[in-house]
Amino acid sequence: MNKLLTTLIALCSLYCGAAAATAANYDNPDTLVVARDGTGQFRTVTEAVEVCRAFMDYHKVIFIKKGTYKEKLIIPQWLQNIELCGEDRDLTVITYDDHANITMDGSFWPKELKDQLLAMGDRPKLGTFRSFTVRIDANNITLKNLTIENNAARLGQAVAIHTQGDRLTFVNCRFLGHQDTVYTGMPGTRLYFSSCYIEGTTDFIFGPSTAWFEQCVIHCKANSYITAASTPKEIMYGYIFNNCTVTAAADVEKVYLGRPWRDYGYTLFMNCELPAQIRPEGWHHWQKEREQTARYMEYNNRGPGAATGQRVGWSRLLSKKEAQQITLENVFSLKSEWTPVAP
């Protein structure tokens, strides 16, 4: 095996764990290499995803070399057990620039989206839920050491990552955008974000999924709302931020922790660092009647924005006993056993 491939295997071992650790693993081939400069097997991430077998019962790594990949990527629902691993978090970037108010023409889109467009006939606006850069419909998918970006101008909602699958893990990733950066789109699905950076303006983490954010940096780029949970009534947990750090741009003055997109939205910040830009009331109701149903909580936060004396009366402070029940095992095992492990 030539020196280049040997080097790539070493990099995968360092950044992605065991799947790409040896030449034998590369040759079988359970590791695919993507490189814009042609030194891998594929030049785009989409090409690598398309060669993966449906419903694989083994682990496959797609190793993505440093570079900027402008593509609208869909990981379809018939795939599973795939890990997308970047060579460098900040220098391995998947980016696109769609936003909700673009008139659709389907250029450079995956065939699935082009077919939807043709069926509509009258070239409507793109809308929030087609504006994604990456959409994950599959289960058991991991992303590591990657930047997912929607770099559209601030002309409407612009999703960077749109999730539909269950048991999705994101480790040391950046999610960059403005409004609606991270859309967790399917009720009952479970997502785990570890050591990630997420930025945005309005409602930039939103949707109905159950998602745990561990040691993440949440950066507010404008006066607005961090979360817009739409957790269904029958689902016990929505968004949980644990040991996270919330930051804000220098010109930002007021930020709400969240507002309920639907009646029973669930959001909990615990053991987090909150900046002075967090509004004293903490939360917004979106619609007055949601004060009766929204599930908004805090526990053991710190920093200038963590004072709870002026919080809205319909939010709650958890007791120590209640907080002890909020564990990964408890939150993610309600549907089936799953405890994600972030190496």
Regions found by a protein language model. Give the residues of each.
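Bacterial Sec-dependent N-terminal signal peptides
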Residues: 1-24, 107-116
